UniProtKB/Swiss-Prot annotation:
Gene name as annotated: rpl20
A Pfam short name: Ribosomal_L20
GO biological process: ribosomal large subunit assembly; translation
Subcellular location: Plastid, Chloroplast
Natural source organism: Chlamydomonas reinhardtii
Protein name per the record: Large ribosomal subunit protein bL20c
MF (Gene Ontology): rRNA binding; structural constituent of ribosome
InterPro entries with a match to the protein in the record: Ribosomal_bL20 (IPR005813), RIBOSOMAL_L20_CS (IPR049946), Ribosomal_protein_bL20_C (IPR035566)
């Protein structure tokens, strides 16, 4: 049986990892072992931060709505309860956008 050498396979694998680690600093973009470790870490961070981003945006929307509502003497939880009891189904993103871009429409929510 002929001897199988895996030079092409390993070169392709190394090249794939090094291409994925372009833009990393120092040895993390040139040496395979460190590039591989940094690449795995970067993928873990990106997975984690895709979920973190959703929490961050929700927190930002709540903060914006809270600050906008406090101008009118309410707080966030009272305002959200008010919307729920009056069957106004707007999500936090839309409410936060209204409070910034269209204060008159936001005021109409309070007067509904």
């Amino acid at each position: 049986m002929t001897r199988v050498k895996r030079g092409n396979v390993s070169r392709k694998r190394h090249k794939k990892i090094l291409n994925m680690s372009k833009g990393f600093r120092g040895a993390a973009s040139t040496l395979f072992r460190t590039a591989n470790q940094q690449n795995m870490k970067a993928l873990r961070y990106s997975y984690r931060n895709r979920r973190q981003k959703k929490r961050d945006f929700r927190r930002m929307w709540i903060t914006r709505v809270n600050s906008a509502v406090r101008r009118y003497g309410l707080n966030y939880s009272e305002f959200m309860n008010y919307l729920k009891t009056h069957k106004i189904q707007l999500n936090r993103k839309v409410i936060a956008q209204l409070s910034i871009c269209d204060p008159e429409a936001f005021m109409q929510l309070l007067l509904f």
